[in-house]
Amino acid sequence: MATPAGLERWVQDELHSVLGLSERHVAQFLIGTAQRCTSAEEFVQRLRDTDTLDLSGPARDFALRLWNKVPRKAVVEKPARAAEREARALLEKNRSYRLLEDSEESSEETVSRAGSSLQKKRKKRKHLRKKREEEEEEEEEEASEKGKKKTGGSKQQTEKPESEDEWERTERERLQDLEERDAFAERVRQRDKDRTRNVLERSDKKAYEEAQKRLKMAEEDRKAMVPELRKKSRREYLAKREREKLEDLEAELADEEFLFGDVELSRHERQELKYKRRVRDLAREYRAAGEQEKLEATNRYHMPKETRGQPARAVDLVEEESGAPGEEQRRWEEARLGAASLKFGARDAASQEPKYQLVLEEEETIEFVRATQLQGNEEPSAPPTSTQAQQKESIQAVRRSLPVFPFREELLAAIANHQVLIIEGETGSGKTTQIPQYLFEEGYTNKGMKIACTQPRRVAAMSVAARVAREMGVKLGNEVGYSIRFEDCTSERTVLRYMTDGMLLREFLSEPDLASYSVVMVDEAHERTLHTDILFGLIKDVARFRPELKVLVASATMDTARFSTFFDDAPVFRIPGRRFPVDIFYTKAPEADYLEACVVSVLQIHVTQPPGDILVFLTGQEEIEAACEMLQDRCRRLGSKIRELLVLPIYANLPSDMQARIFQPTPPGARKVVVATNIAETSLTIEGIIYVLDPGFCKQKSYNPRTGMESLTVTPCSKASANQRAGRAGRVAAGKCFRLYTAWAYQHELEETTVPEIQRTSLGNVVLLLKSLGIHDLMHFDFLDPPPYETLLLALEQLYALGALNHLGELTTSGRKMAELPVDPMLSKMILASEKYSCSEEILTVAAMLSVNNSIFYRPKDKVVHADNARVNFFLPGGDHLVLLNVYTQWAESGYSSQWCYENFVQFRSMRRARDVREQLEGLLERVEVGLSSCQGDYIRVRKAITAGYFYHTARLTRSGYRTVKQQQTVFIHPNSSLFEQQPRWLLYHELVLTTKEFMRQVLEIESSWLLEVAPHYYKAKELEDPHAKKMPKKIGKTREELG
């Protein structure tokens, strides 16, 4: 018998001679199939069913020889089965014996006497055999009844065969899991169908019942409100009538004094006139007394209302969102200081210094060199301020002024004539806001259909939806809405849906053919985000299946030819965007600190350049906040020496109302500087921008599949991004772009385009989503740029380890449930495992807090010690996950107070977002059939549930520090962790990031035995042994004689 390695080499050699090719996985497949077959003909038939081999001639001989060479396990019969088989044979043998008939009584007596003793001896054995036979018959009847129930009365037996090997058992479990998965998917679809209200089907009985119920509730509420409304209306009427009567009385007295002032009146007329004057005076005194009482009431102390025993409610102080926590205290201090400071009036204006002067020293300025000019298509004109433009033009005039408006009819004709259309237009041409409106006006939303427009960023989806709703004159959330992760601002009437590309991907789960959409517009396609690339492949297939679906791919002036080729040579429709020329300036020498150079350049432009707003591109939230603080500090020190400079940040985690400030008109006499991430390159259009500052850097996420480590590093941007940034300056007038790097660096150090995100990120969520959609052949999926093989393989391995995929790569029931949760697969597994450990409420809180991207605590520079002490007060034994749970629990107990957040140095906006995430995840628990339960303070169960999801991320303490269990990579605990000084032996981490070191963030102390409990398929007991914990045997020393 050949060895496995030798057999595999033999199969590869034979495959090469028979088929002309050889591959290791094919050889292993053939050997495994031959081992599972019981005969050579069955093996040949299985190969023929695959439709990959022509089993005639040499191929058939090869299959027969392979079957004869493959070793097979001999079926070993269990002792209990052997004893049972012998008992059955003996029973059949006894039944074959018959007594012979004889007329002689003596012979009968002899036989009876001789056999009496033998019958007594065998009596017990016969009774035992009879009992065993009855039990076997009962077991066979029960097995047949179960088989009839499962197969609907068919003759197929569900009894496990005697010779069932490991492969057959695994196959049976796989088929059973597939049935459960399909049943779960059907239940989810049925629930969605029951909860979906179809406004077009007026005959729906359930809809009628719901409408009647709502009308009845409204009627009851109206009846309950009528008495109070009558009282309120009566009071308002009496007050109004009092004013009218008093005015009539005063007018009547004035007329009488004017007409009969010099006429002798009778005694009755004099008394009547005196009475009217008395009434008028009393009415005036009554009104004055009422006003005086109101004035005193405002300065009077009022006893607070009793609130004990009432449930705490969520309070959102919208008026305090405009700044950091403690904004109200800061405003009060500024008001008091302002009242105490000395101010000059017009009388002292002559004695003051000139209003403006040069505030930068010559050595502080940055020298720029004008290199090129981006040509525009309109003549320069005097740029009107935003306030003047808003006063002179209406919204419709602004729409008509956009570059896309002259091409409206041609664009609609091209959309009608082609199913897929590539639209090329620079940011600001109006393609994002106007094209969906044109389609709406053209009737593409008739018959209940909708139009989807995807955006790569949630900030862009929210701001664009608000702008379109304002232009259409509708309320946001009605006809126009947006849908982003953990926030849905749509309704049943929404026909224009702006959403992130990830949200449209999730809609494929419930509606794989996008039947409710007539047009799908993929905007900002040139950014090539992960979800955008996946959408390309899916929408391409859906478009072939639905000829009536219109697909629009909107991009800037990059990669349009490539998009056209991908979509089967789709036509390209070009829209001009830049309307004015842009001068580009480079520095003479490289800048060492580009953040400091940005601040200096902003002040230099503000002092030396004509009016016009400034746009600064930085890499992330930390740099933006630092730059804004530096600018505000320097402007505060300069005081009245410079004009007013409004510093406005814009990044993804900023609240919506603060994001909307960048779109507000700049006040007269001031200048606005917008400090933004690369979101302002293409996703947003800010009016009034004349100057652009480009340091030439951006943040990119990279992923190492070998270590599973992600890193968000600052890297030079591409030439395409630099050109996009420069184009922001030519929207309203001739602009200028100041690049804080040299022209040589632009030509030789910048890449042409940015690497697509799909080639530098983890693919766990994408693989799970595609598997949920029934796409199993991921290697041949129609990617615009295929991801690296190692990254895809690692994603499959992780999903298999989490139980989302079986050994054949098919989606399991757990995987189908995990796909319903809009979080990372490990986080989804943790939530599903919480049901087993009865701690789903605590796990939901932990999952929500982990989803806010490490932005819970903040450390003001002037209160670092206080912030660190406040953070330490939340520490609990066990790890950072329990710290996050403690923070949220105390915040909830405080009534979701913003003041509590300020006192404990916790970011209120992040906590409010965590609350929104938790509410959505709690609503999805019913969808994935997980019940709500609490551990009642037993945090061991919480830690075990977290381990069930993140057992892939474990590390243990060795003599050289922490190392990951599987990869043996050296890692470090983050200094902000609660376990930084404790150094436990076994750790679990949420993510591994590369900054200055390989840091583990959000670590949790675990026990090694838990890994065997939650993931016995992934860890072996030998891997979890501590080699340093073993004690070596004591050695007995030798004497001098023994040593020789």
Swiss-Prot record:
Residue intervals of the Helicase C-terminal domain: 601-774
Residue stretches of biased makeup (Basic and acidic residues): 169-210
Pfam families, per database record: DEAD, HA2_C, HA2_N, Helicase_C, OB_NTP_bind
The reaction(s) this protein catalyses: ATP + H2O = ADP + phosphate + H(+)
Keywords: ATP-binding, Cytoplasm, Helicase, Hydrolase, Immunity, Innate immunity, mRNA processing, mRNA splicing, Nucleotide-binding, Nucleus, Phosphoprotein, Spliceosome
Any one Gene Ontology cellular component term annotated for this protein: U2-type precatalytic spliceosome
Compartment(s) where it occurs, according to its Swiss-Prot or TrEMBL record: Nucleus; Nucleus, Nucleoplasm; Cytoplasm
PROSITE patterns: DEAH_ATP_HELICASE (PS00690), HELICASE_ATP_BIND_1 (PS51192), HELICASE_CTER (PS51194)
UniProt feature, compositional bias: Basic residues: 119-130
Amino-acid positions noted as binding ATP in the UniProt annotation, renumbered to this chain: G425, E426, T427, G428, S429, G430, K431, T432
InterPro entries referenced in this protein's UniProt entry, alphabetically: DEAD-box_helicase_OB_fold, DEAD/DEAH_box_helicase_dom, DNA/RNA_helicase_DEAH_CS, HA2_WH, Helicase-assoc_dom, Helicase_ATP-bd, Helicase_C-like, P-loop_NTPase
Phosphothreonine PTM sites in chain numbering: T715
Annotated stretches, region: Disordered: 101-210, 374-394
Primary residence: nucleus
EC class: hydrolase
Domain Helicase ATP-binding: 412-576
PTM annotation (Phosphoserine): residues: S103, S106, S107, S163
Subunit structure, interactors included: Component of pre-catalytic spliceosome complexes. Component of the minor spliceosome, which splices U12-type introns. Interacts with GPKOW. Interacts with TRIM6. Interacts with RIGI.
Family per similarity comment: Belongs to the DEAD box helicase family. DEAH subfamily. DDX16/PRP8 sub-subfamily.
PANTHER family: ATP-DEPENDENT RNA HELICASE, PRE-MRNA-SPLICING FACTOR ATP-DEPENDENT RNA HELICASE DHX16
Chain's role: Required for pre-mRNA splicing as a component of the spliceosome. Contributes to pre-mRNA splicing after spliceosome formation and prior to the first transesterification reaction. As a component of the minor spliceosome, involved in the splicing of U12-type introns in pre-mRNAs. Also plays a role in innate antiviral response by acting as a pattern recognition receptor sensing splicing signals in viral RNA.
Protein name listed in UniProt: Pre-mRNA-splicing factor ATP-dependent RNA helicase DHX16
Organism in which the protein naturally occurs: Pan troglodytes
Lineage: Eukaryota, Metazoa, Chordata, Craniata, Vertebrata
